[in-house]
């Protein structure tokens, strides 16, 4: 038999999960009830479009000090909410941006999309959910690398030292091609950003940006649609998304979310499946020990896919248009082409390419467009180069034939580990004119290599294009991929040892 105290406790628990009807309650704000299991009720300010409350399974998840919103908040917007059948749509309009939120009856998901005609004045386009860090302290999948709570700043205002470890919101990043879901979580709740559409973002398949950051007061869950963070492309206008914020109690949600209902919600810029086409074909010629990626882009959209082990591929559903088509070995471009996509049809297009070099005396690393395997590359994505967990940067000496790849640094800093010395042995038939080809992935502040071979000093190359963005200290390695060829005159290389 239950005591009165036990009975009251059970009734209280049950009351926290009982749902009202699917719908909108209107006052100074719109209160949206999703009518979902483990109930989801959220509140949107009618003047600003800020989400000011998110109650999931009876618990307030929203940070009380500041709302969740697009950019740094719209300030003021024309905000409306409508219910049609099984769907609710919230629309927030300014002169240059429209933010949409969509909810389906019974689902614990806030679907969103952002339509722009100009880049926001803050210079980047992002959605940030500011959530209660007491309830949702953890970040997934990379953990504490981006938890900067109580940290001491060591670089700008975005890299911190916490309990002897360097941390930054940038260390939460993942390549776009691999980032379909990132989450923050606690013992009773998990909130995930599900990303199934990058078409209007910028940067290509290997771009990466901030995903989450527990800064102490609140835990931020982001979707960065574009930014100047090591950005290689111009920004695209139009509709960004759909993207979805999924609420659960424990399990990690699937990334397979159907947002085709957006076609019925009068979303500016939304192109339904019927208005799209695909590209199918076979890629060939690249080194099969690496992943192969095919990438399509133009001024309006971008898409990508991994190929199968045999090289076959089918693109995502693409908006009609003519696209540059790129074939990568890892992240290294081996071929480019062009293809035109038409609505309602599949276009056949094969692509072939490989790395072409002359007779090679020595090679350090692989043709994959990444610093994988070089010293500190395994840590660089998740910590600052100054971190005590990093191996000694040098200066280092690499001896061809006996050194391991980790004896060569993944980055060269002028005041830290320059020069890097390479020793190699040449035969008599290798003493003619040669080319030392140095392939880089990223530069900063005009940094570029100048080589000396024995007594010959190569000319200083011109400065690379300035990305105007910190990279290697914020977990990035991919830039324009500048290549520097040093012409080595005949007789410079000698039989025997060379440096």
From Swiss-Prot:
Signal peptide: 1-20
Catalysed reaction equations from the record: Endotype eliminative cleavage of L-alpha-rhamnopyranosyl-(1->4)-alpha-D-galactopyranosyluronic acid bonds of rhamnogalacturonan I domains in ramified hairy regions of pectin leaving L-rhamnopyranose at the reducing end and 4-deoxy-4,5-unsaturated D-galactopyranosyluronic acid at the non-reducing end
Gene Ontology CC entries for this record: extracellular region
Chief subcellular location: secreted
Presence of keyword Lyase: yes
Pfam short name (any one): CBM-like
InterPro entries, per the entry: Carb-bd-like_fold, Gal_mutarotase_sf_dom, Galactose-bd-like_sf, GH-type_carb-bd, RG-lyase_II, RG-lyase_III, Rhamnogalacturonase_B, RhgB_N
Matching Gene3D superfamilies: 2.70.98.10, Carboxypeptidase-like, regulatory domain, Galactose-binding domain-like
Purpose of the protein: Pectinolytic enzymes consist of four classes of enzymes: pectin lyase, polygalacturonase, pectin methylesterase and rhamnogalacturonase. Degrades the rhamnogalacturonan I (RG-I) backbone of pectin.
Protein name per Swiss-Prot or TrEMBL: Rhamnogalacturonate lyase A
Organism annotation: Aspergillus niger
Taxonomic lineage: Eukaryota, Fungi, Dikarya, Ascomycota, Pezizomycotina
